[in-house]
Each structure stands twice: as C-alpha cells, then as structure tokens.
Amino acid sequence: MENTPKLNVPKRKPTGEMRVVYFSSTTENTKKFCDKLGLPATRIPIKLSEEIEVDYDYVLICPTYAGGLDDFKGSVPRQVIKFLNKVQNREHCVGVVASGNTNFGETFGLAGHVLRAKLHVPLLHVFELIGTKYDEELVRERIHKLWNWEE
C-alpha cells in the first residue's frame, strides 16, 4: 500500500507559468469561469477532429457530463479523454478542477473525481455551472498554492 499515490497530493511541483487547460461546450460555462480566473488558458477543441498538444504544466478545468441519479457513464467529455490520451498532455496535468450541476445529484462534479483518480493529481475544487466569485478566488488561490508547493 505504500506505493499507492495519495489522491490529493501533487506528484511533483509544477514548473513554468501558472496555466489552465479547459474544455467548454457551446454553452461556454467553463470558458466563462476560466476567463474570470485571469490566467493563461488553452481551450481543448470542441470538434473531435481537431487536436492540441501542450508542452507546459497546467491545471485541467473540466465540466461533468453525466445523466444524474445512477448514470455515472460518460462523465468526462470525449474531447478531454482524447486530449489526455496523448502522453505529453497527460504528463503535464498537475491538478484538476471540475464543474457540474447540482440538479444531477450524486454525479455533481463527477468528472473531477474520475480524472483525479486516473491522473493521480489533486482535485482542487468543484464548482456549479459558471461558478461564483468565491469559486474563482478559491481556484486561483489553490492553483497558486500548487505552483508554490514544497515536498
């Protein structure tokens, strides 16, 4: 059990500028949240035929796509899965923030929990829809702490 990574502890200290990579559907809720963070941000394309590759550390901000109640399938958007299937993109992810809708009950923010477990990175926060001023401040603070984390 000693080799099991701790889920909310960074695996390493991020390097370079604080950045976010995010996915936002055509509703642009996640984009609106990211715009308010005031950090350099890269958007994962909506079209599955388009690809991006990053060469810098980042926090992934991802909406949750799940049907609610007991429908836990498909919580991470396909575009995000495709982006993370590239080893370089996956290795540069140092943390996750998720959004969701509390109307969907137990699946609220589920993408964040799935990604945290798969990527072995901390889940920094889960916010609803476009978030609040409090969510923005908390995410900025936690990203800053992550970049300044000491082992």
UniProtKB/Swiss-Prot annotation:
- InterPro entries found in the cross-reference section: Flavoprotein-like_sf (IPR029039), RNR_Ib_NrdI_bac (IPR020852), RNR_NrdI (IPR004465)
Gene Ontology biological process: protein modification process
Q: A Gene Ontology MF term for this entry?
A: FMN binding
Role: Probably involved in ribonucleotide reductase function.
Q: Which NCBIfam families match?
A: nrdI
Q: Which HAMAP family match?
A: NrdI
Q: Which family does it belong to?
A: Belongs to the NrdI family.
The entry's protein name is Protein NrdI
Report the source organism.
Answer: Mycoplasmoides gallisepticum (strain R(low / passage 15 / clone 2))
